[in-house]
Regions:
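Acidic, low-complexity terminal tails and accessory targeting/binding regions
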Residues: 1, 82, 95-107, 156, ...
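An N-terminal RHG(E/S)-centered segment typical of histidine phosphatases
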Residues: 1-58, 71-82, 207-243
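Short, well-ordered beta-to-alpha junction loops that form the rim of enzyme active sites
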Residues: 6-7, 63-67, 91, 131, ...
Length: 243
């Protein structure tokens, strides 16, 4: 199973700029599910697709219904000689941020100071903003999705195109990470899930009583460094298309 975060979106760019300039919000004029890819994001997806097509043959593709994920999936699949069945899957959509959607850290502190205090008290993992989700909420739906895969996709290769929080949630569930272990990954800038980064698992029959999926790569960036969205991802980027 290969899990890929969507390519760079217009909101990713606006969010980064807003944090640097101290703005309160970014991209609230467009619904989160309607945010498209940037031109650079399209190139990231195309390059990642070329890499994947040389190494994997997928039987099924599951994609978040958010536009940026759907665009990423279609662009990545272009180089594949065999086009697998593609399914839009609500359970791997972006984490819902509720009233905090589109706000920077400064924006949350300025507009909802009590919510910021509650988040500090409850911690990032368990905090649920009004109208939004916590990490455990996301884990519940991803756990349900994994149950569907176990039932319907046994002995198949699967590609999942989703979002950074969902990628980390897959790791939490598949590797049985604790809250502390997950947040340590989330806090480390060197482990920040890059746009179009690949995380993949392979079934290991020797693991556990009846075998389980074993992590083979986390956050692999397989496109040229000049297409990377951040300095951290630029350091990870390498070109290895296998031509």
């Amino acid at each position: 199973m290969a899990i890929v975060r969507h390519a760079e979106s217009e909101r990713n760019v606006r969010r980064l700029a807003a944090h640097k300039t101290g703005e309160l919000e970014y991209g609230r004029d467009v619904r989160d599910m309607d945010v498209p890819l940037t031109t650079r994001g399209e190139k990231q997806a195309e390059a990642t697709g070329r890499y994947l097509s040389k190494r994997f043959k997928f039987d099924r593709v599951f994609v978040s219904p958010y536009l940026r994920a759907v665009q990423t999936a279609h662009l990545m699949l272009r180089p594949f000689a065999h086009h697998p069945r593609l399914t839009h899957e609500e359970r791997i959509r972006e984490k819902e941020f509720g009233i905090l959607d589109g706000l920077t850290r400064h924006g949350i502190i300025n507009k909802y100071p009590n919510e910021w205090k509650r988040r500090e008290r409850e911690g990032k993992y368990y905090y649920r903003p009004p109208g939004g989700e916590s990490y455990p909420d996301v884990a519940l739906r991803v756990h349900s999705f994994l149950g569907t895969l176990a039932r319907d996709c046994r002995k198949q290769s699967v590609l999942v195109v989703c979002h950074s929080v969902v990628v980390l949630t897959f790791r939490r569930l598949l590797e049985r990470l604790s809250e502390k272990e997950l947040l340590a990954i989330d806090r480390d800038p060197e482990l920040d899930v890059c746009n179009c980064a690949i995380t993949w698992y392979e079934f290991d029959p020797g693991a556990g009583e009846s075998g389980r999926l074993a992590l083979r790569e986390f956050n692999g960036v397989h496109y040229p460094a000049d297409l990377a969205s951040t300095d951290e991802c630029r350091r990870k980027a390498h070109v290895d298309f296998g031509f």
